[in-house]
């Protein structure tokens, strides 16, 4: 399985809290949709999280704009998340 990183440096390379494509809260690396070496890693280092949340309640506190739905960094355009498979 491809390793994915989450938003921020809090738990790099480890499971983080976020929403999957179904909108449910999970603590699993499957929520992280941007792999290492991705050209989209600008904006907040190499850490991205899925959808609109990082670590659940902490949100973008540490790295504003590095999550899906952000108004600051959204290099993927729509930010829907689809197009970067978590499976």
Curated annotation (Swiss-Prot):
Signal peptide: none
Keyword Iron belongs to the record: no
Cysteine pairings via disulfide bonds: none
Record bears the keyword Ion transport: no
Superkingdom classification of source: Eukaryota
This protein's UniProt keywords: Keratin, Repeat
Matching InterPro entries: KRTAP7 (IPR020184)
Pfam family, any one: KRTAP7
Region (8 X 2 AA repeats of G-[YCGS]), start-end ranges: 37-84
GO cellular component terms, A-Z: intermediate filament
Family statement drawn from the similarity comment of this UniProt entry: Belongs to the KRTAP type 7 family.
Subunit-level organization: Interacts with hair keratins.
Main function: In the hair cortex, hair keratin intermediate filaments are embedded in an interfilamentous matrix, consisting of hair keratin-associated proteins (KRTAP), which are essential for the formation of a rigid and resistant hair shaft through their extensive disulfide bond cross-linking with abundant cysteine residues of hair keratins. The matrix proteins include the high-sulfur and high-glycine-tyrosine keratins.
Protein name, UniProt field: Keratin-associated protein 7-1
Lineage: Eukaryota, Metazoa, Chordata, Craniata, Vertebrata
């Amino acid at each position: 399985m491809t390793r994915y990183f989450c938003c921020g440096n809090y738990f790099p390379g480890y499971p983080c809290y976020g929403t999957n494509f179904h909108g449910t809260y999970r603590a699993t690396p499957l929520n992280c949709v941007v792999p290492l070496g991705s050209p989209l890693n600008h904006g907040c280092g190499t850490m991205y999280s899925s959808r609109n949340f990082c670590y659940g309640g902490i949100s973008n506190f540490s790295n504003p704009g590095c999550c899906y739905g952000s108004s600051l960094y959204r290099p993927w355009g729509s930010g829907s998340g689809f197009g970067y498979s978590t499976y």
